[in-house]
Amino acid sequence: MTPTAQTTASARRVVFPFTAIVGQEEMKLALLLNVIDPKIGGVMIMGDRGTGKSTTIRALADLLPEIPVVANDPFNSDPSDPDLMSDEVRQKSGTGAEIPIEFKKVQMVDLPLGATEDRVCGTIDIEKALSEGVKAFEPGLLAKANRGILYVDEVNLLDDHLVDVLLDSAASGWNTVEREGISIRHPARFVLVGSGNPEEGELRPQLLDRFGMHAEIHTVKEPALRVQIVEQRSEFDQNPPTFLEKYNPEQTALQKKIVEAQKLLPEVKLDYDLRVKISEVCSELDVDGLRGDIVTNRAAKALTAYEGRTEVTVDDIRRVITLCLRHRLRKDPLESIDSGYKVEKVFARIFGVELLEDDSSQKNGAGQIKTGVR
């Protein structure tokens, strides 16, 4: 670790370790897959209050390894990938000039509910541009979030036009700011994570569809698990350094697994017949557009890479398809069946597999419980 990174690490607040989080496997899987392949398009997490949504997201950001960035660059430009460089860095790179590099933790940027569009996208100093002839740009939160995680708590309460801006940037990987005929563009490739409580209002279907995955979490009902969660939290609060030390081997192992999955991802193959069946499921469920097909393909590949394999199996698809499709189904007020269960039923029929009892148990918040990611 570099001296700069050590200083930053000591200044950071202590975060509950990701591998110590009990249950909520659906949410954890969705977050991990988005980190392995950000092109999945982010994740929307809807669930009850106090179920560990914010804690898990912050824990994930803290878990991720350091990345190389161009020193003193507000956009966290990648020194080796032109698609993730600001214009200034790309010009320097083109002339063969030496680019100073530093290592820093993956950024976790919180977007407050009261944020303005200028604060999110950045602003252009028109006066300076006209008087001095330079593009004076004040970067916003999207610039800071490049190559990191952008977290919006209570996303269902955020202004619709801001949600649109975020989703456009997340999908394209670029943010464009135009004022008075002056245009500035910079990379903004990030994992968009939104969370909310459905009791406080729903997100519009056309915006919900733009999130790659949708995880539903519920309060853990099993008394033994609740006690375990309370005890772990108490242990962490009493002595954070000792608690972190205890989980350090698991954190390091998971971090290594994520890095290896990112490297393995380009080699993962998804058989044509399986791709056809994924599209059959989407067609049968009357999913609008092709986002559902694309995201399910990407998520299945990311899961396969995470498991250390290069061939996608039916089970890989089964584990991700509900996360990728449940929020894309048309809402029928007279329909009593859960949208996730509906996806599972259609999947089981088209892929010719048995509907697992465990799948429906995911609705109780403890589905497919393991103690942490171990």
From Swiss-Prot:
> What EC number(s) has UniProt assigned to this enzyme?
6.6.1.1
Q: Highest taxon of the source? A: Bacteria
Kindly list the positions annotated as binding ATP.
47-54
The GO molecular function terms of this record are: ATP binding; ATP hydrolysis activity; magnesium chelatase activity
Q: Which InterPro entries match?
A: AAA+_ATPase, CHLI-like, ChlI/MoxR_AAA_lid, Mg_chelatase_ATPase-isu, Mg_chelatse_chII-like_cat_dom, P-loop_NTPase
Q: Which GO terms describe its biological process?
A: chlorophyll biosynthetic process; photosynthesis
Q: Which CDD domains match?
A: AAA
Show the SMART domains listed in the entry: AAA
Q: Which UniProt keywords apply?
A: ATP-binding, Chlorophyll biosynthesis, Ligase, Nucleotide-binding, Photosynthesis
Q: Which reaction does it catalyse?
A: protoporphyrin IX + Mg(2+) + ATP + H2O = Mg-protoporphyrin IX + ADP + phosphate + 3 H(+)
Its pathway is: Porphyrin-containing compound metabolism; chlorophyll biosynthesis
Write one Pfam family the protein is assigned to. Answer: Mg_chelatase
The similarity annotation says:
Belongs to the Mg-chelatase subunits D/I family.
Q: What does this protein do?
A: Involved in chlorophyll biosynthesis; introduces a magnesium ion into protoporphyrin IX to yield Mg-protoporphyrin IX.
Give the matching NCBIfam families. BchI-ChlI (TIGR02030)
UniProt protein name: Magnesium-chelatase subunit ChlI
Give the source species: Nostoc sp. (strain PCC 7120 / SAG 25.82 / UTEX 2576)
Q: Which gene encodes it?
A: chlI
